[in-house]
From Swiss-Prot:
This is Regulator of G-protein signaling rgs-10. One of its GO terms (biological process) is negative regulation of signal transduction. Keywords: Developmental protein, Signal transduction inhibitor. It comes from Caenorhabditis elegans. Residues 135-252 form the RGS domain. Shown to have a role in viability and embryogenesis. PROSITE patterns: RGS. It comes from the Eukaryota. Disruption phenotype: Sterility and embryonic lethality.
């Protein structure tokens, strides 16, 4: 699809007129069918659902049947509404520069068997773990807490969608010189036919992303709407749910028990 457009909103408007008429657009060559674009299975939209309020006008252009109210404060000093718990923590994870340490912690957290053989100095203190209960922000301040939460999100939703959201967030701050190649990498990894990490979205939205890739000057907005679409699927009170999840509760029991770490997990796994 080739569109002679000059702004992201122009892309959305043009595609809407071309695609919205399809009753059941196809997603892939396997003839999978998705819901019509006019009946997206998403919750009621509010400010807190969007990672950046600047994305809302573009979202409304793309999905006029699922409008979100734009934030127009009467006073410039008014604080913006709080974002969804998960978005606060995801943004912190995406901004971290030490990705090797992040990956190492995630590998430890993937299974209790790995954690069983980890050393005590790789674990947070009981005070740190208790502090995570205060708010999403205090959890986000902990690298270990962030990555435990990411593992929780992946188990609750989709690993590929969480990875896609994080890649999009890092893409937003990427250098202009590398943005074209990075945009192509993200598209190939999450949208290309046959990709093992492919995320499944509306055919219409897939076309929108493809059009941004070709026509968006600077590629700054290429994945804005797709990232928002994935973010809308995350539970609004995910911080509370995380604190009730066995992944967190088991860690609390471990760091507060004062027993030998290996013995603790040996007993848990029997």
């Amino acid at each position: 699809m080739s569109l002679a457009v000059f702004s992201p909103c122009d892309v959305a408007s043009k595609l809407l007129s071309e695609v919205v008429g399809e009753k059941y657009p196809k997603v892939d060559d396997d003839d999978s069918i998705v819901e019509p674009v006019t009946s997206l299975c998403l919750p009621q939209l509010s400010y807190e659902d969007f990672h950046h309020f600047s994305v809302i006008p573009l979202w409304n252009k793309t999905f006029p049947c699922r409008l979100a109210t734009e934030w127009n404060p009467k006073n410039k000093k008014d604080a913006p509404p709080k974002k969804k718990n998960a978005l606060v923590i995801l943004e912190r994870v995406a901004s971290r520069s030490n990705q090797n340490a992040v990956s190492r912690v995630i590998n430890i957290l993937r299974s209790k068997v790995h954690l069983m053989f980890s050393s005590s100095n790789e674990l947070p203190s009981s005070e740190d773990v208790e502090r995570w209960k205060k708010s999403p922000e205090t959890l986000a301040a902990s690298e270990y807490g962030c990555n435990l939460f990411i593992q929780f999100l992946k188990e609750q939703t989709s690993e590929n969608e969480v990875d896609f959201w994080l890649d999009c967030q890092k893409f937003r701050s990427s250098k202009m010189s590398s943005r074209q190649n990075e945009a192509r990498r993200i598209f190939d990894e999450y949208f290309a036919m046959g990709s093992p990490k492919k995320i499944y979205i509306e055919r219409y939205l897939w076309c929108v992303v493809q059009a941004y890739l070709v026509n968006d000057p600077g590629w700054r907005h290429t994945f804005d709407v797709a990232q928002a679409y994935v973010g809308l699927k995350l539970a609004k009170k995910s911080h509370k749910k995380f604190l009730e999840d066995p992944l967190y509760l088991d860690l609390v029991e471990l760091v507060t028990s004062g027993v030998n770490y290996n013995k603790f997990w040996h007993d848990k796994l029997e």
